[in-house]
């Protein structure tokens, strides 16, 4: 080939410029010596080997269509621009596969492989495990960059790791994750996980920096919903949960093959827990729930937002402010009873205990909710979405400034601790269940059984709070310290509630504000319980020994008991 090419080039270069080349390949000089099916093109590189490039198609017809001429500089450099005329090139009908740029100069001819960066259009699927194969027990090293992209996904089902945004290899520990993050989380939950962030616990975790901070990586694993029992549970119900589970927003932003964004399964906890939660709560109450399932139930029990639905005129007066606050409190009390009934295990307590717990804790629950709503608004108290007061605006109410300052201080402390919603709902449930401790004086068998259930429920909610704290990714020592800080705030809220009761009672005595039935009953019951301890009386109206004509204890005639009974009847009718 090389020996025959040199005289060919000499013949072409030796032609006189006055004799133009013919336009058609069939009229080229015979010195070229090339058949119609091949084109001999010298290589521009320094090597001496030359090869023929064959078109994937039949030979050119007798009267071929002339394609636009290509510059000779695409094939070899010319010392004289007039020394070589334009060389027409006949294009073949179709290539076996489509390239994005066909007429580029010297397209790379290396074979297409199904490597990591090759196009998904050139391969039907990647190689690896199916998502429903679970987490497996292989000891994989997350330091291997290829291990994180070896997931088995069809083009339309491609997913990304919710932790580092690399290609997901499957559904591991309750979320879509790559092999590296799966192996890291497995090692963390099985062995040493006392990681400490060298910075501020806000390190960026992505595909390139996922190994820079183990503490922040583990924290993000928990934030995105990875859990120890998630993989085994999801292994059986993967297809069903994938069809029916709603999606949530997360910090990750995965994109599909065509660039379409995919929403991640959002949640502080995975949504697939909803089906086992409903079955367990119907069959065995809270005793059949794991801590994460209990947290999910308490989250679902959260009441909706409230509105005052009226505009307060400025300047504010003592009567207008107190009237607005009591109206909001009365609305929240109605929702609070429904909220308490949705906490797993609460309806298993006796009616007397349910009423007693609500009467003891209602203002603490309201104040905790007020602090939570105000956590992102420094210097303001968000009583409702349409009633926001700062410290100066509350100065018109006599004796309320100390309460305002304590509320702002509590909200500021929650903001410093970066309180999570899972922790907040657990604290609120603890306030409800731990509000009254004098029920030990009751000797009735029903009440003793109810109190035993209450203590078990209190332990379960405490375990749920510990689990919620463990999701923050802190070390064991830091988790213990955080638990202590959160529980110490409950005593602050109890002290604040007592001051609020005294202030509301003074407003009632001065006739500054008109209290509604439910709020008035709650206030009177709380003040009565703070003055003395009730005598030991069997107060369960369901006791068989109780005659239908036997008068009920006074607390069971209250509006609270009426609302609790109404909720019980409505739930029974729905079932």
Swiss-Prot record:
Signal peptide: none annotated. Residues 290-526 form the NR LBD domain. It is found in: Nucleus. Ovary and testis. Residues 134-145 have a biased composition (Acidic residues). One of its GO terms (cellular component) is membrane. Residues 537-549 have a biased composition (Polar residues). The keyword DNA damage does not apply. One of its GO terms (biological process) is gonad development. Residues 161-226 bind DNA. SUPFAM superfamilies: Glucocorticoid receptor-like (DNA-binding domain) (SSF57716), Nuclear receptor ligand-binding domain (SSF48508). Binds estrogens with an affinity similar to that of ER-alpha, and activates expression of reporter genes containing estrogen response elements (ERE) in an estrogen-dependent manner. Binds DNA as a homodimer. Can form a heterodimer with ER-alpha. Belongs to the nuclear hormone receptor family. NR3 subfamily. Composed of three domains: a modulating N-terminal domain, a DNA-binding domain and a C-terminal ligand-binding domain. This is Estrogen receptor beta. It comes from Ictalurus punctatus.
């Amino acid at each position: 080939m090389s020996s025959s090419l040199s005289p060919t080039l000499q013949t072409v270069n030796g032609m006189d410029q006055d004799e133009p080349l013919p336009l058609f390949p069939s009229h080229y000089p015979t010195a070229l010596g090339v058949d119609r099916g091949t084109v001999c093109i010298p290589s521009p590189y320094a090597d001496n080997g030359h090869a023929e490039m064959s078109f994937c198609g039949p030979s050119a017809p007798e009267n071929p269509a002339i394609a636009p001429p290509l510059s000779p500089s695409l094939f070899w450099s010319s010392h004289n621009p007039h020394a070589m005329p334009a060389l027409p090139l006949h294009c073949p009908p179709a290539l076996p596969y489509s390239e994005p740029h066909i007429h580029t100069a010297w397209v790379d001819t290396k074979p297409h492989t199904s490597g990591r960066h090759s196009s998904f259009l050139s391969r039907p699927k990647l190689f690896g495990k199916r998502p429903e194969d679970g987490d497996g027990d292989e000891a994989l090293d997350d330091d291997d960059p290829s291990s994180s992209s070896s997931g088995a996904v069809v083009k339309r089902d491609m997913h990304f790791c919710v932790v580092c945004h690399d290609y997901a290899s499957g559904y591991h520990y309750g979320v879509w994750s790559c092999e590296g993050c799966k192996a890291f989380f497995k090692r963390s939950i099985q062995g040493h996980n006392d990681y400490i962030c060298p910075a501020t616990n806000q390190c960026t975790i992505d595909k390139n920096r996922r190994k820079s901070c183990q503490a922040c990586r583990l924290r993000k694993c928990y934030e995105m919903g990875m859990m120890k029992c998630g993989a085994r549970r999801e292994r059986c119900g993967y297809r069903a949960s994938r069809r029916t589970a709603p999606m949530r927003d997360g910090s990750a932003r995965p994109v599909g093959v065509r660039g379409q964004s995919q929403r991640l399964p959002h949640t502080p906890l995975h949504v697939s827990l909803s089906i086992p939660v409903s079955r367990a709560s119907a069959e065995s109450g809270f005793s059949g729930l794991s801590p994460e399932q209990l947290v999910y139930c308490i989250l679902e029990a959260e009441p909706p937002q409230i509105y005052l639905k009226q505009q307060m005129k400025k300047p504010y007066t003592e009567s207008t402010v107190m009237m607005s606050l009591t109206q909001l409190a009365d609305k929240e009390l109605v929702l609070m009873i429904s909220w308490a009934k949705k906490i797993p295990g609460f309806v298993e307590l006796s009616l007397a205990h349910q009423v007693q717990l609500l009467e003891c804790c209602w203002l603490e629950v309201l104040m905790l909710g007020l602090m939570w709503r105000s956590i992102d608004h420094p210097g303001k108290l968000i009583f409702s979405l349409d009633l926001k007061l700062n410290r100066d605006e509350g100065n018109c109410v006599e004796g309320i400034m100390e309460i305002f300052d304590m509320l702002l201080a509590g909200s500021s402390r929650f903001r410093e601790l970066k309180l999570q919603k899972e922790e907040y709902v657990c604290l609120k449930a603890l306030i409800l269940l731990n509000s009254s401790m004098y029920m030990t004086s009751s000797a009735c068998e029903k009440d003793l059984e109810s109190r035993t259930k209450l203590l078990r429920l209190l332990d379960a909610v405490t375990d749920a709070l510990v689990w919620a704290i463990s999701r923050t990714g802190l070390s064991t020592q830091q988790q213990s310290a955080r638990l202590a800080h959160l529980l110490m705030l409950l005593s602050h809220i109890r002290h604040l509630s007592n001051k609020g009761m005294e202030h509301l009672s003074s407003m009632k005595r001065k006739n500054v504000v008109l209290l509604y039935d439910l709020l008035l009953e709650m206030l009177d019951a709380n003040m009565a319980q703070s003055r003395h301890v009730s005598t030991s009386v069997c107060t369960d109206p369901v006791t068989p020994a109780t005659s239908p004509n036997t008068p009920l204890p006074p607390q069971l005639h209250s509006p609270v008991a009426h609302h609790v009974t109404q909720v019980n009847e409505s739930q029974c009718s729905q079932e």
